[in-house]
UniProtKB/Swiss-Prot annotation:
<dbReference type="InterPro" id="IPR001392">
    <property type="entry name" value="Clathrin_mu"/>
</dbReference>
<dbReference type="InterPro" id="IPR028565">
    <property type="entry name" value="MHD"/>
</dbReference>
<keyword id="KW-0168">Coated pit</keyword>
<dbReference type="InterPro" id="IPR022775">
    <property type="entry name" value="AP_mu_sigma_su"/>
</dbReference>
<dbReference type="InterPro" id="IPR043512">
    <property type="entry name" value="Mu2_C"/>
</dbReference>
<dbReference type="InterPro" id="IPR036168">
    <property type="entry name" value="AP2_Mu_C_sf"/>
</dbReference>
<dbReference type="Pfam" id="PF00928">
    <property type="entry name" value="Adap_comp_sub"/>
</dbReference>
<dbReference type="GO" id="GO:0035615">
    <property type="term" value="F:clathrin adaptor activity"/>
</dbReference>
<dbReference type="GO" id="GO:0006886">
    <property type="term" value="P:intracellular protein transport"/>
</dbReference>
<keyword id="KW-0813">Transport</keyword>
<keyword id="KW-0472">Membrane</keyword>
<dbReference type="GO" id="GO:0030122">
    <property type="term" value="C:AP-2 adaptor complex"/>
</dbReference>
<comment type="subunit">
    <text>Adaptor protein complex 2 (AP-2) is a heterotetramer composed of two large adaptins (alpha-type and beta-type subunits), a medium adaptin (mu-type subunit AP50) and a small adaptin (sigma-type subunit AP17).</text>
</comment>
<dbReference type="GO" id="GO:0072583">
    <property type="term" value="P:clathrin-dependent endocytosis"/>
</dbReference>
<dbReference type="GO" id="GO:0005905">
    <property type="term" value="C:clathrin-coated pit"/>
</dbReference>
<protein>
    <recommendedName>
        <fullName>AP-2 complex subunit mu</fullName>
    </recommendedName>
</protein>
<keyword id="KW-0597">Phosphoprotein</keyword>
């Protein structure tokens, strides 16, 4: 359990304090200010001062600190702290000192509803907004609500689906799915993959009437292998990688997903919240299809000259394209002049970044472009100066309708008692995480 919560500014001043248990006094905030905020060293997010544990996150100039003297689950505390950030931002867009001071009554109301005696009770923004609302700068409390509305709030807050009200109606029932993946890569100068993984998330925008039951199907390897054995091993041989499914290492679901159903038959079934939400997160490290391959060639011609050739090749279909592609090619700190020739896009030497920035607005699939540069270096008088460390080339990009992991939505079924047929849209997007190639 959490004994106390503090919201502090960058100077260590306490903006909000809520003591949930009597084993903590407000004075412990001063110890945190001296040991963490007052220190110039980089600190871990968990700090033990005496017998008191401080777990904190920093958002802008605001520290959100959970305090406990018990053997508390640190992951639970950090989950609550991050949920607090999301809740505060849903009420006032910017989480800064002025917003907290101007809405301190609202913040205390939220803290009292979210935690009870230090135990998390309600972290659902949708439920909290039913009875803690802010209109025209004044907080509307429960005593101003009608009795029937209070009853509905109670039923929803304590029911099986607190994230969704039953009386939602839309003239046009729509469902949007966005599969967004971030590719992380570290490749050696010889072209060997040293580290590669994909972090993905499935975002949904739900505009459905009533209480729809949704069933989501993905090409998980466990599901695909099970279906193959059920069908006697008969499966289409075309697109073998996609047919065999992908191996998901880690997966996390929204609270609306029935985990028991997923554990038993790997079915993702749920009653979705209204509006936008994150259905699931996943991570995979096997059989990653890299969207771009970088082939760097760097020759040091003596102490004052350097020749550089960087070829970037797209590994996806010619029907697709990469958008806003940016290649950052590092140069030595003593660079004087850069002569650059590119086959596509625009490139410029940026002395403040010690790098050549190559931008290609639209990069077609199954294509390669090359940048060539002659770099003249200033002669160094200091003979003891260290040699150029050759930092890695990094990339930024976005590729639509492509997934590096091979993840795909197989089906999405919606069942509701009014028997409507919703309009469904699916979009895929792959972007660069930490995408680097050593030279």
């Amino acid at each position: 359990m959490i004994s106390a919560l503090f919201l502090m500014n960058g100077k260590g001043e306490v903006l909000i304090s809520r003591i949930y248990r009597d084993d903590i006094s407000r004075g412990v905030a001063n110890a945190f200010r001296l040991e963490v905020i007052g220190s110039q060293e980089t600190r871990s997010p968990v700090k033990l001062i005496g017998s008191t544990s401080f777990m904190y996150i920093k958002v802008g100039n605001i520290y959100i600190v959970g305090v406990s003297r018990q053997n508390v689950n640190a992951c639970m505390v950090f989950e609550v702290l991050h949920q607090l950030v999301d809740i505060f931002k849903s009420y006032f867009d910017n989480l800064d000192e002025d917003s907290i001071r101007n809405n301190f009554v609202l913040v205390y109301e939220l803290l009292d509803e979210i935690l009870d005696f230090g135990y998390p009770q309600n972290c659902s923004t949708d439920v909290l907004k039913l009875y803690i609302t802010q209109g025209q700068g004044k907080l509307k409390s429960l005593d101003k609500l009608k009795q029937d509305k209070i009853s509905k709030i109670t039923i929803q807050a304590t029911g099986t689906t607190p994230w969704r009200t039953p009386d939602i109606k839309y003239k046009r029932n729509e469902l949007y799915i966005d599969v967004v993946e971030s590719v992380n890569l570290l490749m050696s100068a010889e072209g060997n993959i040293l580290r590669a993984d994909v972090s993905g998330q499935v975002m949904m925008k739900c505009f459905l009437s009533g209480m729809p039951e949704c069933k989501f199907g993905m090409n998980d390897k466990v599901i695909m292998d099970r279906e193959k054995s059920t069908n006697g091993g008969s499966a289409a041989r075309s697109g073998a990688r996609r047919a065999n499914g992908i191996e998901i290492d880690d997966i996390t679901f929204h609270q609306c997903v029935r985990l028991g159903k997923f554990d038993s038959d790997r079915t993702v079934s749920f009653i979705p919240p209204d509006g936008e939400f994150e259905l699931m997160r996943y991570r995979t490290t096997e059989h990653i299809n890299l969207p771009f391959k970088v082939i760097p060639i760097v020759r040091e011609m003596g102490r004052t000259r350097l020749e550089c050739s960087v070829t970037v090749k797209s590994n996806f279909s010619s029907k697709m394209f990469g958008a806003n592609v940016k290649v950052i090619i590092p140069t030595p700190k003593n660079t004087a002049v850069c002569k650059i020739v590119v086959a596509a896009g625009k490139a410029k030497y940026m002395p403040e970044q010690d790098a050549i920035i190559w931008r290609i607005r639209r990069f077609p699939g199954d294509t390669e472009f090359t940048l060539r540069a002659e770099v003249e270096l200033m002669a160094s008088v200091n003979l003891d100066k260290k040699a150029w460390s050759r930092p890695p080339i990094s990339m930024e990009f976005q590729v639509t309708m492509f997934t590096a992991s091979g993840f795909s939505v197989r089906f999405l079924k919606v069942v509701e008692k009014s028997n409507y047929t919703p309009i469904k849209w699916v979009r895929y997007l792959t972007k660069a995480g930490t995408y680097q190639n050593r030279i």
